[in-house]
Amino acid sequence: MTQLQISLLLTATISLLHLVVATPYEAYPIGKQYPPVARVNESFTFQISNDTYKSSVDKTAQITYNCFDLPSWLSFDSSSRTFSGEPSSDLLSDANTTLYFNVILEGTDSADSTSLNNTYQFVVTNRPSISLSSDFNLLALLKNYGYTNGKNALKLDPNEVFNVTFDRSMFTNEESIVSYYGRSQLYNAPLPNWLFFDSGELKFTGTAPVINSAIAPETSYSFVIIATDIEGFSAVEVEFELVIGAHQLTTSIQNSLIINVTDTGNVSYDLPLNYVYLDDDPISSDKLGSINLLDAPDWVALDNATISGSVPDELLGKNSNPANFSVSIYDTYGDVIYFNFEVVSTTDLFAISSLPNINATRGEWFSYYFLPSQFTDYVNTNVSLEFTNSSQDHDWVKFQSSNLTLAGEVPKNFDKLSLGLKANQGSQSQELYFNIIGMDSKITHSNHSANATSTRSSHHSTSTSSYTSSTYTAKISSTSAAATSSAPAALPAANKTSSHNKKAVAIACGVAIPLGVILVALICFLIFWRRRRENPDDENLPHAISGPDLNNPANKPNQENATPLNNPFDDDASSYDDTSIARRLAALNTLKLDNHSATESDISSVDEKRDSLSGMNTYNDQFQSQSKEELLAKPPVQPPESPFFDPQNRSSSVYMDSEPAVNKSWRYTGNLSPVSDIVRDSYGSQKTVDTEKLFDLEAPEKEKRTSRDVTMSSLDPWNSNISPSPVRKSVTPSPYNVTKHRNRHLQNIQDSQSGKNGITPTTMSTSSSDDFVPVKDGENFCWVHSMEPDRRPSKKRLVDFSNKSNVNVGQVKDIHGRIPEML
């Protein structure tokens, strides 16, 4: 292969890798955006998300979209990312036919000009479309679950648990619906993590997010409920909002307000601000912010909370609808509510076309309030209640026309009651029908205008009105829907009920909180009492010797400055207990086990006092010699052959020149200071003895003689004249002989240790280990003299170290040497 071919191959490979790495990726497929169903002879519009494709090079780069293989009736606008068109009836000849077709969506990354193509599926059908029912009123539904903003939103407190349940009857062609979806409004994105949708019950449930500021304006979240007759697509959507804020600006008005003009066309209407609430109380003038007209015609004006204007003559006429508009009302925190208005010229007495059914809880007090805004001219209208079915028991319910209140005690066996609300004005009469439906006890949602919830079902009306009003409650237009609300005269009753509820809550809190505190205190006391029973007082516990301090350098005299290694003989700290060997050996620290003269007190601490007065950290081996040869004259000490070992400073774990190391307490130093005239032996000795020597006490197999005498060290600082003892013959180690020899030796020591000042020293130098041998007599050990050394193989080794450090038990694997003899 030539160099040119290799170069071209590498270039192609690099280009391919570049395409693989830098190609835009599919972030939000069109299939998950639930595109609408295209229906013949109906307009089709669908805007895809700008996050359908994302750049893999620059996350902020915008993707440019283009579409291919579109049918003739469908077009795509790249600038707005919108599909639009209208399929003709010729496309599908048979009834109830569905046709799927594919389109190719191309996305180009503006960062590096790379592209991504994907194929997506759309559908067109000639099935009858699904739409909203004419009597559906979104505000009337949301009012059952809390306060509203007067337009299309439910107001929530931060961290409030809520649910909103929709009714299947709000859709037409209900039998053709196969699926329901709950999504976010923008591009039908998934719901946030604090909101859930149950497609079986059409219920949104969740907990409102937290607001971190008490003065921050409210935040709106838009959602949709989608109904479809083709899986994976959308047929009709109902949009609503959840508004969360630190303060709640709400209204109890749940329908469009009707302004009925006279033949002159003059308009004058005061805004019903007494139906506006801030944090559950009627809003005061100092808390009011701006008031604005929205989508109003030029001839409508707003002045000091009053709507005024004059309808043009060409718009006047019987049952005409000259204008629809809204008014936004803000508070000082930036929260907003809306009033929706319809200007009409009509002879109708009702401003609404139907009334919803009302739920009543069996065995409880029932009350419901109608709104003056439900009438076109409430001041000049007489309102009454009629019972349409005389066979039903209706004696329990009463109607007060003065405040439009319906109230009574619901019977326990109540099922249903059919009623009609009748409006009369002169010779004109109009009536709307509704039902009161009995329900079992359940938790209801309180509001400003009613203590009972309401549901929607089929409605009937005898109204002769023929006008159609547009509402602001849904994304898809529908006819004006029914609503209920309270009258101004009913406000005192509602406030009274609210005050009663607050008192009941206060009483409940006053009882429940102290009981809760007492219960918590009792639980804490029981827990404390139980722990006290499981853990008795310290004075009842047995006194135990504390465990050894593993970090105390005195416990490791040979490991100072040593290289740390993993010690195979180390014990796990968790394994220490009161019966462990380490604790038992630690108890031996209180015994005087040093190999000193028997004349010393067993609890004497004079040695330690003298050691502490010396102020030196080293000792002289001449005071601790255990071999008679050490007491004889020696030639001057030559420098050690090994740069590491010093015969004058031997460790208890090492032999030098086949000589045993001295046995010294790790608390002992040999540089003793002069004995004071006043010496107290009242302190317990803390000296210890080597554990291996302590337990290695076996009687020799046979008695041997030696010509060496038992001699006290001539280097003792308290004895300048010590005479050698006569040679003694070995005897059978009977108790009598052992005692006799021991007493004779002690007498010789006492005779030879009289100082110039007549002071008998308390501490004597250690006798030779060649002469005294422990012999077991029954359960006790006695010391006898051995005339000849009994040499046996020792387990200790003569070692060499390259690091010139002291001996560390953890370094046993690195030690090399020979095994010497041991006395």
Curated annotation (Swiss-Prot):
Q: Which keywords does this chain's UniProt record carry?
A: Cell membrane, Glycoprotein, Membrane, Phosphoprotein, Signal, Transmembrane, Transmembrane helix
Biased composition, class Low complexity, residue ranges: 449-467, 760-769
Q: Which stretches face the Cytoplasmic side?
A: 530-823
Positions carrying Phosphoserine are 642, 673, 676
The record places the following residue ranges in the Extracellular compartment, namely 23-508
**InterPro entries named in the record:** Cadg (IPR006644), Cadherin-like_sf (IPR015919), Ig-like_fold (IPR013783), Immunoregulatory_rcpt-like (IPR051694)
Q: How is it modified after translation?
A: O-glycosylated by PMT4 and N-glycosylated. O-glycosylation increases activity in daughter cells by enhancing stability and promoting localization to the plasma membrane. May also be O-glycosylated by PMT1 and PMT2.
Subcellular location per the Swiss-Prot or TrEMBL entry: Cell membrane
Instruction: Give the misc comment.
Output: Present with 396 molecules/cell in log phase SD medium.
The protein depicted here goes by the name: Axial budding pattern protein 2
What species does this protein belong to?
Saccharomyces cerevisiae (strain ATCC 204508 / S288c)
The gene from which this protein is expressed is AXL2
